[in-house]
Amino acid sequence: MRLLHVVVATVSLTGAITSLIAAQHYNVSSDVIGGIEKEDFGVGCNSRTKYPTAADTSKLQPRFAYLITNSLADFIAVHFIKFNLPDNDFVQIRAADPSAVDNRVLRYRGNESNGVFFADALSTKSVIVELFTNASSSAQKTNSSKCVGFAVDSYQYLGEGSTLNGSKEEVCGADNSREASCYSGYTNAFRASNAVVRLLIKKSTGSFFCTGWLIGSEGHLITNNHCISTQSHASNTEFEFMAQGSSCSINCEGARACFGSIRASYATLIYADATLDYALVKLPINLSGQYGYLRLRSSGAVMNERVYVPQHPAGWGKRIAMKSDNGFGTVTSLTMGGCAPNQVAYYLDTQGGSSGSPVLSWSDNAVVALHHCGGCPNTAINSYKLVNDMKWRGILPANACT
């Protein structure tokens, strides 16, 4: 469990740092799996560095600092295997480069964070992990059943698009999807895309990109079960809104490109269903008033109706797939097999990371299917199945369907 304080500024420190240890991994080592690099550092908790016990009168200088550098990194997300600090102490993580685009400063405080968790990912190739203490540790409250301090065992630095059982979500012919802002003139569709969110899910096997979207008016979000299937997944997911270019000319083709606003770093899992491949979570803050929300069509998709898919393929900035090689995208089947029986099919372009995207009807901007599987055509779970299942379980959010 942890609460995160974010300061949007870089930190400038003067004077000597008590302890600065550099771990510079310029190349991937042989034991790296899925964008994970092993580490072994910390303060207290049986690490090589003892936890400070003398009072610290300075609020500017860290008592400990550790540098992580990886030239292959798209981001760096530190994994804490132990975290139990005195109430007023905190660990701070920031980009080592003061000119880094992602200039957030992440702070995890002793009275708000504990246990095992991933820090938020910073989009940079080098970070500094620092410990700040504000008073004698002996005078502050801690969990007496645990060691005092923190320990890091690894960090994640690359993400891949999540797919269902290795199925390939595909571009069908030429990639006809476009940057979301290219469709700003299509007012209703562009407004609907505001509810679509880029997800970075940090799992024990690595980091994965997916797409999710706000459903109903109570602060819920839906994505695929193969993206989020456990509370641990939900607790280690970053929910990034408005990750898109401000104009059509801006190229957002890159993992975590066109940085948006990470409004939540965890969620509560309401239910995940493997058969229908959906996961319903609730964010710690209701953002439906700010970004709007989408609604499922209770009657489901209609054969040959025009559809479009706002999405974050490969963790890129938001794109909208509205056209195929043969014109505007339409529902081409309601009975497609493959990843599931009786799927909705369409020839709109997707990639790994598009999983969980809404398939919306052009006529009423209702969600008619939940994209989840690749191939040409690409396929999705019909919306009426989701509505019926959530109603039966008593978990359908308010204003979640038409």
Swiss-Prot record:
Secreted effector that completely suppresses the host cell death induced by cell death-inducing proteins. Glycans are attached at N27, N111, N134, N143, N165, N286. Gene3D superfamilies: Trypsin-like serine proteases. The gene is RXLR73. This is Secreted RxLR effector protein 73. It comes from Plasmopara viticola. Has the canonical translocation RxLR motif, but lacks the canonical EER motif, which characterizes most oomycete effectors identified so far. It comes from the Eukaryota. SUPFAM superfamilies: Trypsin-like serine proteases. Pfam families: Trypsin_2 (PF13365). A motif (RxLR) lies at residues 104-107. GO terms for cellular component: extracellular region; host cell. The keyword Transcription does not apply. Keywords: Glycoprotein, Secreted, Signal, Virulence. Belongs to the RxLR effector family. It is found in: Secreted; Host cell. PANTHER family: LYSYL ENDOPEPTIDASE.
